[in-house]
Amino acid sequence: MSERAPVVTIDGPSGAGKGTISQLLAKHLGWQLLDSGAIYRVLALAAIHHDVELENEESITLLAAHLDVKFLTGNEKDPVQVILEGEDVTTAIRTQECSNAASKVAAFPRVREALLRRQRAFRTAPGLIADGRDMGTVVFPTASAKLYLTASAEERAQRRYNQLQDKGFDVNIERLLAEIIERDDRDMNRPVAPLVPAEDALVIDTSDKGIDEVLELALNYINQKLSNTN
């Protein structure tokens, strides 16, 4: 790991556009990309595969410490290929069931601690875009630039609905909205590493903004912050 490699953190709730913007920023800057949410999704999927109870913090923590996961360069559709125990789970971790399970295991303090070092190891030259929920507050508190993307629950539910429909999943938008509201409450009120903007983060509401507009705002801010540190 290189402590001197610059880091840009992108935090925010599910469906706010973190993944899309993070991928575009990493491609534009030629930097590494950390999708921290994928790590928790992989852990949740591993727990499901091994019949580990999601409410059992001790068992989940043990699983996290020995998690056999690799992140490989993917394709245009899936820029990052996720391999769990030798199996490609890139699509499997994107189900709503896996998303809800990930939020549950992420609430355990010992699980978060077990995965902290693994996440920080992604910090390598020339730089890192870190996408998650506590990247700027806990994992990389001294990041070069911090962004927090948000959007209304209704807008995020619609985006998630469209995304899952495109992948061939049969989903109900009312149920999606209820699950998003429930997850927001769980993520924002957990005792360890709650979902909140870092004090020095630029907050961008993406509800009524297109991808290009958000990307331009993010790049302008990042370039400004990086120029101030050089």
Curated annotation (Swiss-Prot):
Biological process (GO), any one: nucleobase-containing small molecule interconversion
Taxonomy, top ranks, is: Bacteria, Pseudomonadati, Pseudomonadota, Gammaproteobacteria, Alteromonadales
In the record, the note on similarity to other proteins reads: Belongs to the cytidylate kinase family. Type 1 subfamily.
Q: Note one Pfam family from the annotation.
A: Cytidylate_kin
List the EC numbers from the record: 2.7.4.25
Gene Ontology molecular function: ATP binding; CMP kinase activity; dCMP kinase activity
**What CDD domains has UniProt attached to this entry?**
CMPK
Q: Which UniProt keywords apply?
A: ATP-binding, Cytoplasm, Kinase, Nucleotide-binding, Transferase
The entry's protein name is: Cytidylate kinase
**Catalytically driven reaction(s):** CMP + ATP = CDP + ADP; dCMP + ATP = dCDP + ADP
Domain of life where this protein originates? Bacteria
Where in or outside the cell is it found?
A: Cytoplasm
Concerning InterPro entries, the annotation shows: Cytidylate_kin (IPR003136), Cytidylate_kinase_dom (IPR011994), P-loop_NTPase (IPR027417)
- Main localisation: cytoplasm
Among SUPFAM superfamilies, the record links this protein to:
P-loop containing nucleoside triphosphate hydrolases (SSF52540)
Q: What class of enzyme is it?
A: transferase
User: Which GO CC terms are listed, alphabetically?
Assistant: cytosol
Q: Which PANTHER family match?
A: CYTIDYLATE KINASE (PTHR21299:SF2), CYTIDYLATE KINASE/PANTOATE-BETA-ALANINE LIGASE (PTHR21299)
Sorted alphabetically, which HAMAP family does this protein's record hold? Cytidyl_kinase_type1 (MF_00238)
Which residues of the sequence carry a binding annotation for ATP?
12-20
